[in-house]
Design a protein with these regions (language model features):
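Generic alpha-helical structural context detector
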Residues: 63, 119, 163, 225-228
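NAD(P)-dependent Rossmann-like dehydrogenase/reductase catalytic/cofactor-binding core
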Residues: 190-255
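A short N-terminal beta->alpha junction/helix N-cap motif
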Residues: 49, 104-105, 211
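C-terminal substrate-binding/catalytic lobe of Rossmann-fold NAD(P)-dependent oxidoreductases
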Residues: 70-73, 78-207
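N-terminal Rossmann-like NAD(P) cofactor-binding subdomain of oxidoreductases
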Residues: 1-99, 201, 223-225, 234-237
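A generic structural signal for alpha-helix starts
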Residues: 56, 153, 217-218
Length: 255
């Protein structure tokens, strides 16, 4: 409801100090994917967007691969659990696809998650596009990314790039898995992106990679992370609140 600047500003007018939109936002001060561009948050930002759960999964995949291999162009498909934007039985919806029963069909539909990558990694503007297939599962989704790299590579190199990223600079938002897991195994996992090393395919410079994500719980964790970061950026008598949120964050990740 409050996903554009005009409507989100109503919260500020009512006395709120900051607004974090839990969805892609329009004309916001910044779109932040925690772990990727949260260092840009400042006290001047009053209305920010946490992007989408899918963008939060895709960005930690794309960043290290682009830095090491160069991403020339790519297409993403998210195999996405159904959400409350869909109908449980066939009924009216502005999107004819989403008017169909979420529990009875696989439903192709649109997503802006791939294009939104440019808002957090500007050099990728125009290089990525994508679509979604909504499936009749309650939770946990999968990003399937195919891209043309700037040079030839191998399965081993791609997996090593992702493993290193998950162990170092992206350790808070990216996990690496080389076990034969399925969607239910990632339920209630707090990471934005869980890279599935067993699904990596390479043909010269053509690369396919996949990552799982709990599209509810993982995204909620990033909302909390960005809230803490925004509080720290403002530094207006918030150390007690920030410390309490940090403690809550630690408890959540241990669940």
């Amino acid at each position: 409801i409050f996903t554009d600047r005009e409507k989100a500003n109503l919260h500020l007018q009512a006395g709120a100090k900051k607004v974090i939109i839990s969805a892609p936002g329009k004309n916001v001060d910044a779109t932040i994917v925690y772990g990727i561009n949260d260092h840009l948050l400042s006290a001047e930002h009053n209305i920010i967007s946490n992007a989408s759960c899918t963008t939060n999964c895709l960005a930690p995949m794309v960043k290290p691969l682009h830095e090491q291999l160069g991403l020339e162009s790519g297409y993403m498909t998210t195999i996405h659990a159904y959400t409350n934007d869909q109908q449980l039985t066939d009924a009216y919806h502005p999107d004819v696809y989403r008017a169909r029963s979420a529990t009875h069909s696989m439903i192709p539909t649109k997503t802006g998650a791939a294009a939104a990558i440019a808002e957090v990694i500007p050099e990728l503007k125009g290089r990525l596009d994508g679509m979604a297939v909504r499936v009749p599962t309650i939770n946990v989704s999968l990003v399937d990314l195919t891209f043309n790299a700037g040079r030839e590579t191998s399965i081993q190199e791609v997996n090593q790039i992702m493993k290193k990223a998950a162990e170092t600079e992206l350790q808070d938002v990216l996990s690496y898995c080389d076990k034969p897991l399925v969607s239910v195994d990632y339920n209630h996992i707090p990471f934005s992106s869980n890279f599935d090393a067993l699904q990596t395919k390479v043909n010269g410079s053509l690369v396919k990679v996949m990552a799982w994500y709990d599209n509810e719980w993982g995204f909620c964790n990033r909302m909390l992370d960005n809230t803490i970061t925004l509080l720290d950026a403002n530094n207006h008598d918030t150390p007690i609140i920030s410390a309490a949120l940090s403690s809550a964050k630690g408890q959540q990740k241990n669940l």
